[in-house]
Amino acid sequence: MLKKTFLIVTLFSFSALLTSFTPVKKSQQFLKTVIIDAGHGIMANGGHNGAKGTYSYEDDICLAVSKKLVAQLRQTYPDVKIIETRSTENIVSLKERANIANHNRGDLFISIHVNAMPPIQHRDLAGYQTEVYYTGKGKKKKKRTRKVPQYRYYTTPNTRAKGTQTYIWGAHKAEDKEVAVRENAPMLAEENYQEKYGDIDPNSPEFIALSLVKTKQFGQRSAMLSQMVEQEFSKIGRISGGSKQRQVGIWVLQATAMPSILVETGFITNPDEERYLNSGEGQLELAASITKAVGNYINWLEKKQNPAAVSALLSRQAFPAKVDESFLEALDHHQHTSR
């Protein structure tokens, strides 16, 4: 049973990677909606929710960079719909951010953040304190003293870390991502979905298998975009920390039914980086790099399409419950040789 489930998933994986639920057309627009998420925000009590530098806050930098990114994306890709999850200084809940992205049927989710290092912990010997203690019992009980070291504990800012990092959700979060994909399946389907594929039960084994593969597809696309973002950062002289899976703090990435990345634009705890992140020039550079990465991502999607393979696949049942192994082996061979 496990083997057959794997075989079904393998077929869906290939079909999802090629079709993204729909037949490929030469005039197809590969990116229709991009969601830009400015991280954090000011809370109802007026407090800041993100990291703090010497004189600035993550909330403000995220919004400033996101605004410039939105403007550049709209100018560069006028046919692409750009949606903001947070357009003001006020905080938006993580659940609402995901709802905005899923409701607008985003093809891409880019969350803008600022990194920070925790302060360095220090312990210094401040002196000694005399401590009285007793040994023995009864007539043999004796009073004694000893010197006990006293320490002073304090912290200093960690200013060494610098550079960018771009994250995707961790592998252990794939199940949560798959749930998001399945729950938002009606939003992902095109208007004439039933006409093309018939009545599909989102709880059916076939649809669950497809959701699992769609999750895998989103993971691959997220990883590709994250690498492209870091490559563009390197081109402008930023120190790139690379593309990584994030184990914590990425709920909004796993709750969005689309390729999703979280961009750490720099370390606010580094004085040089804090100045750069607050400068108009720095914010424009960061926005331009991400915009170029989106363009590279679109080109990559276009090159991945294989209309011939899609046509052959669509000639079969749209959501097959069983697939012969020889067909799967042929598809798997094609997938590996076409890389």
Stretches with model-predicted labels:
Residues 8-16:
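Bacterial N-terminal signal peptides
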Residues 1-5:
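Positively charged n-region of N-terminal signal peptides that target proteins for export
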Residues 6-9, 94:
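Generic alpha-helix initiation/capping and coil-helix boundary signal
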Residues 24-32, 51-339:
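Active-site-proximal helix/loop segments of hydrolytic enzymes
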Residues 39-44, 266-270:
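Short connector loops/turns at beta-strand edges and beta->alpha or beta->beta junctions
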Residues 44, 48-52:
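Peptidoglycan cell-wall recognition and remodeling modules
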